[in-house]
């Protein structure tokens, strides 16, 4: 008989973390566009300077005036997410190659879920498991947000707010619509050839770009008629800072009821759980312009 599965020394970050946050097409897009920084556990207040600094010209022998500007603060709160999967306890008896294959697939899935969680919390403020806004998330991009009609209007809004765009996050359906847009009604020449068919693109009109349905939240959020649905977010993504506070370990659970689905021993099951603690902070909401449509 094969030895029972042992996960105490396995850490996802040591094996599959590099690249999966930014390259997996099913994952989120914020981690591709926004800088990752270090956050500590708990709640962190960050000083922000959103006004343009204005230096004073001082004549020889003249007194210097005060730079009359008080910084504001934003709060980054640690958020914990978990994924828990159940398997038949026969998994413990499988050969090593099979067990490692299961763990690799599970690790990939967990990292995708964690990446999507960052987007769904940071853009919509929702608990990904329920699709509803969570009071654990103090601020998010769509909070009290009005949208703009198209990308030109998004660029104009950023410019009016004194920001330069660094990237665009697309909903895949909207990206596909743009990819199929032609130069004219009688032309077959794509207006945006860099989008190809709307899959796997990394840039758009000179800006870094990515696509995920986390932008609209179409898989998680049920919207009422008239609600705003994000189609694209053009932003100076330096204003969205995020970080992983704790690596993502796998835990094998063989007893108890870890997810409310019944006793593991009674059901001849084991559970594998991964948790991630992360934080993010939005430095200035004016650094984001959101193209939206209205739910029918």
How would you name each of these model-derived features?
Residues 81-86, 274:
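Short amphipathic
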Residues 49-50, 88, 171-173, 212, ...:
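Structured loops at beta-to-helix junctions and adjacent beta-edge loops in soluble globular domains
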Residues 148-263:
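Extended oligomerization regions of viral-like shell subunits
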Residues 86-164, 290-296:
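Alpha-helical scaffold segments that mediate packing/assembly in large oligomeric complexes
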Residues 55-57, 95-96, 177-180, 242, ...:
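Short helix/loop capping segments that flank catalytic or ligand/cofactor-binding pockets
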Residues 1-28, 36, 252, 258-296:
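Protruding loop/beta-arch "assembly-hinge" segments enriched in small, turn-prone residues
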Residues 2-83, 287:
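Assembly/oligomerization interface modules of large self-assembling protein complexes
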Residues 55, 80, 120, 124, ...:
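Cell-envelope/extracellular anchoring and linker segments
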């Amino acid at each position: 008989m094969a030895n029972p599965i042992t996960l105490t020394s396995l850490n996802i970050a040591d094996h599959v973390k590099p690249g999966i946050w930014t390259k997996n097409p099913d994952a989120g897009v914020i981690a591709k566009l926004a800088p990752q920084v270090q956050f500590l556990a708990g709640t962190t207040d960050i000083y922000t300077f959103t006004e343009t600094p204005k230096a004073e010209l001082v004549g020889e022998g003249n007194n210097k005036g005060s730079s009359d500007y008080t910084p504001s603060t934003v709060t980054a709160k640690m958020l914990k997410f978990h994924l828990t999967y159940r398997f038949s306890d026969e998994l413990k008896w499988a050969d090593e190659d099979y067990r490692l294959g299961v763990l690799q697939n599970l690790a990939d899935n967990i990292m995708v879920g964690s990446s999507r969680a960052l987007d769904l919390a940071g853009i919509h403020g929702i608990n990904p498991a329920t699709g509803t806004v969570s009071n654990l998330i103090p601020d998010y991009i769509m909070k009290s947000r009005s949208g703009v009609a198209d990308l030109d209007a998004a660029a104009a809004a950023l410019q009016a707010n004194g920001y330069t765009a660094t990237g665009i996050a697309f909903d895949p359906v909207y990206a596909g619509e743009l990819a199929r847009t032609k130069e004219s009604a009688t032309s077959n020449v794509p207006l945006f050839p860099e989008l190809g068919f709307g899959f796997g693109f990394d840039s758009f009109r000179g800006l870094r770009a990515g696509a995920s349905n986390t932008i609209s939240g179409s898989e998680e959020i049920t919207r009422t008629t008239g609600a705003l649905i994000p189609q694209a977010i053009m932003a100076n993504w330096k204003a969205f800072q995020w970080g992983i506070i704790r690596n993502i370990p796998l835990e094998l659970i063989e007893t108890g009821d870890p997810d409310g689905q019944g006793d593991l021993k009674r059901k001849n099951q084991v559970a594998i759980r991964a948790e991630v603690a992360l934080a993010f902070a939005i430095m200035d909401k004016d650094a984001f312009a959101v193209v939206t449509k209205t739910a029918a």
